[in-house]
């Protein structure tokens, strides 16, 4: 199971690198809002955290039942793929039409989720994954970077003001639930519980 997790980590990092490459194409496009660029710029933080986790797991393994961390990584990987697909669609769009292409990509490829929400979601997934006792102490620096990035993205104006889906909140373990799509980070502990839902304001 550990090798399967390492393989999933490696695959997810490669997809992140592809997303980073796509974002680089549009990083200077001022027609796209700050949160779009904030999300693209912070993909590298996620990749670095996953690379660090891969290195620590190779040396120390993981504690406890491995089904939960594997499932969590699969959920994270789905968000990474959605982000890559959205950035790719925007990067391939004509320079004068990137914003409408982004709107279409969010609807078609992101299930209504804008890139900053997808990136915040994957960051939360990685923070929860890093709670595993075998790597928790060694991942403190990366987790701190991710939590700061989550808060920064949460305080940015949304990359799209319309055609948005509701906000999704998820907590898969005993760690903090960080839920702040368009506001400051709040933390709620649910011991061993799973909370997943859609909330509209």
Task: Locate the predicted segments by residue.
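N-terminal amphipathic alpha-helical segments
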Residues: 1-62
